[in-house]
Every structure is written in structure tokens, then in C-alpha cells.
């Protein structure tokens, strides 16, 4: 009788062991934080660089053991719409990811889907471009808008002054943006307009908002076409444009390219080109003495992706919240959190003298 009891106990233990192993495996699996990153579109060097930084952060988090899993998807450039982003987000919500990091194409239209993710317990962060503040938990901002505008106008003003423009010689400027719904470009344009009213930059003028601010959207072909049109309008004289400023990482290289390929080029001694771009995208133009693109403005894009993942992981694990005072962002050190926003750092202005220092 006693031996039967012992046998029964051993049988129960034997049956429990596989169950315990399965349960432990499930618990281990559930402890892995799934972080999903959604750019405005895929296949462009700016967002590719941010992805590289994000993957670096994931590798760093998984150094001792696997604690984070990285998912990455986005619409192609020629389909960079809110609906395409929403379709991807819906899939991630169904997969029950822990963190979504998104650069919205339309900050208002995407809000409903982001709120749905939040209701499902997903931490929502924006990077590069913001959404409505009530539709995300944290905005990982690359640089404050005023800093971007300052860097762009400083770069343009420096080149123009070398060509004889200044307080006594007005220069007409034009900007190439993206879509009118893009929150970043609208914020930067607003700051540029404000700075143009100050004594330091009052000699630089956007004469006509309708004709001198271009909105090609995210399509590369349209961007190239409109940049070509702008290049054809540049030159000396009050009826011409003296400075072209690219407000996207697609527009600025397009301006350099369109000048280079123009059959009839404006006088390089009368014009200036600058704008936002990754250094590698405009390095050839900046180093070319026959091209008027002489300065670029950006931030460390890889660090932006890295910072976004660090913040997302710590929000998912409860190490920080939207109301925390700061975040310890790995190799980037401590970054302050103010009004549900963390800022990477100041704008980076580069030219021929230092562009080789940057490889992205």
C-alpha cells in the first residue's frame, strides 16, 4: 500500500515537471519586451540611420540576456500615407507588442489608432515628428524647433554674406518642405518666419508664401521635380531666388542634384543652398567647389533611434513614466523629461571642414 502511494506521488511529480517547464518558458517569453518602430517611410537614409541606432540599443539591452525584441516596418516612400501607417499599427496592436515608436505622417489622423494602442496597454512614443500629445506617452524630439530654424538660417546667411548680401542687399529665399500636414516642417517654417522678422535676419525675405514655399510631399520624384523648378528660378535680381533651404532630408540632396544636372545653371557666385540632410547624402555636393550647397544641418540620427528605444524599453518596464524628471539613456547619459518630451540635443551644422567626421 505504501509503495503504491510513493508510486502515485512520483507519477504526479513526473507529470508536473513538463508543465512547470512550459510555464517557466512562457514566463520567460512574456518578460521579453517587444518594441516596434514605424518610420514615415522605409528605404531612405535618414530613417535607415535611426533604425541602425535603434538596433544598437536593442543589442545593448540584450547583452546579458534577451530582454527586448525589435520589430521594424513602414510604408514605401511612394505610399507614405496615414492609412498605410495605421494598417501596420493595427497589426502590432493585434500582436500585443509592448512599445510602439512612430514618426507620424499625419499627427492628427493617426491619433485615434495611437489611443487604441494605449488602451490596449501599449506604451506609445513618437520620434522625429510628434502626434497629438494625448495620443502618446512620450515624444523623443531630435532638437527644439527654434534650434533647427536658427541653424538653417545661420548656414544660409553665412554663405549669402560671402557673396555680398546683407543688411544693405536683400536676399530672397525659398524653402522646400514636405506635406502641409507634416508637424516638423510646419514648426520649423513657423520659427523661420519668426527669425526673419528679427534684425539679424530681416534682410532675408520670403516674398511670396504661395510660390516660394514648396510642398512636394514624401514622393522623391515630385521632390526632384519641384527642386529643379526652384533651381531654375535662382540667380541675381529682385525677381530671382538667392537662397534655397531644404526642410527635409530628401529635399536638400535633391537641390544639390538638380543644380548639378541643370543644363542652364544659375551663377554660383549669386546663390546659396543649405538644408536638413544626413551628411553622407550631401557630402559629394558640399565637397564640390562648383556646387552652391555648402552647409548642412541635422542631428545625430543614429542617436535619435538609440534614445527612442532606450526610453521605450524603460517605459515598458516601469523604470520611467511620462512624468519622470529624466531618463538614463545608456551611452547618451541622462536626458531631462519635460512636458512628456525628451530632447536629444542641439542641432548640428556641418560643412566641408568637418563633414568627413560623420558617417551616416
Task: Cite the ranges covered by each PLM segment.
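Hydrophobic alpha-helical segments within soluble ligand-binding/sensing domains
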Residues: 85, 140-171, 187, 220-227, ...
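Hinge/cleft segment of the Venus flytrap/periplasmic-binding protein
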Residues: 169-184, 300-301, 305-360
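Short, low-complexity disordered leader/linker segments with a strong preference
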Residues: 1-34, 93-94, 115-120, 356-357
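Flexible loop/hinge segments that line or gate small-molecule binding clefts
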Residues: 110-147, 163-176, 280-287, 293
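Hydrophobic alpha-helical
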Residues: 94, 99-119, 192, 212-285
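Extracytoplasmic "Venus flytrap"
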Residues: 34-61, 71-86, 103-107, 179-186, ...
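Short beta-strand elements in bilobed, periplasmic/extracellular small-molecule ligand-binding domains
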Residues: 60-78, 197-220
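Short, solvent-exposed amphipathic alpha-helices that sit
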Residues: 48-65, 148-152, 183-204, 222-226, ...
Amino acid at each position: 500500500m505504501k509503495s503504491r502511494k510513493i508510486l502515485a506521488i512520483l507519477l504526479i511529480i513526473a507529470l508536473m515537471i513538463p508543465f512547470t517547464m512550459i510555464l517557466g518558458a512562457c514566463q520567460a517569453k512574456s518578460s521579453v519586451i517587444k518594441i516596434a518602430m514605424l518610420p514615415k517611410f522605409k528605404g531612405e537614409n535618414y530613417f535607415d540611420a535611426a533604425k541602425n541606432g535603434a538596433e544598437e540599443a536593442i543589442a545593448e539591452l540584450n547583452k546579458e540576456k534577451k530582454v527586448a525584441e525589435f520589430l521594424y516596418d513602414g510604408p514605401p516612400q511612394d505610399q507614405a500615407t496615414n492609412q498605410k501607417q495605421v494598417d501596420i499599427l493595427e497589426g502590432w496592436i493585434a500582436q500585443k507588442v509592448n512599445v510602439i515608436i512612430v514618426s507620424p505622417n499625419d499627427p492628427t489622423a493617426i491619433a485615434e489608432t495611437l489611443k487604441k494602442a494605449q488602451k490596449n496597454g501599449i506604451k506609445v512614443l513618437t520620434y522625429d515628428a510628434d502626434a497629438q500629445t494625448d495620443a502618446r506617452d512620450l515624444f523623443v524630439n531630435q532638437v527644439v524647433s527654434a534650434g533647427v530654424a536658427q541653424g538653417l538660417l545661420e548656414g544660409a546667411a553665412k554663405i549669402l554674406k560671402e557673396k555680398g548680401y546683407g543688411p544693405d542687399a536683400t536676399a530672397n529665399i525659398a524653402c522646400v518642405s514636405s506635406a502641409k500636414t507634416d508637424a516638423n516642417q510646419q514648426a520649423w517654417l513657423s520659427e523661420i518666419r519668426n527669425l526673419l522678422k528679427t534684425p539679424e535676419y530681416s534682410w532675408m525675405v520670403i516674398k511670396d508664401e504661395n510660390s516660394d514655399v514648396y510642398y512636394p510631399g514624401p514622393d522623391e520624384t515630385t521632390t526632384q521635380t519641384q527642386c529643379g523648378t526652384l533651381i531654375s528660378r535662382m540667380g541675381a535680381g529682385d525677381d530671382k531666388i538667392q537662397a534655397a533651404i531644404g526642410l527635409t532630408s530628401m529635399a536638400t540632396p535633391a537641390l544639390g542634384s538638380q543644380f548639378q544636372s541643370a543644363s542652364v545653371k544659375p551663377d554660383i557666385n549669386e546663390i546659396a543652398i543649405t538644408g536638413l540632410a544626413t551628411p553622407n547624402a550631401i557630402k559629394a555636393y558640399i565637397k564640390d567647389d562648383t556646387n552652391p550647397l555648402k552647409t548642412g544641418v541635422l542631428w545625430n540620427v543614429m542617436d535619435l533611434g538609440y534614445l527612442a528605444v532606450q526610453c521605450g524599453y524603460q517605459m515598458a518596464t516601469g523604470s520611467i513614466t511620462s512624468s519622470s524628471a529624466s531618463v538614463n539613456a545608456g551611452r547618451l547619459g541622462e536626458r531631462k523629461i519635460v512636458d512628456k518630451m525628451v530632447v536629444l540635443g542641439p542641432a548640428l551644422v556641418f560643412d566641408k571642414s568637418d563633414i568627413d567626421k560623420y558617417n551616416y
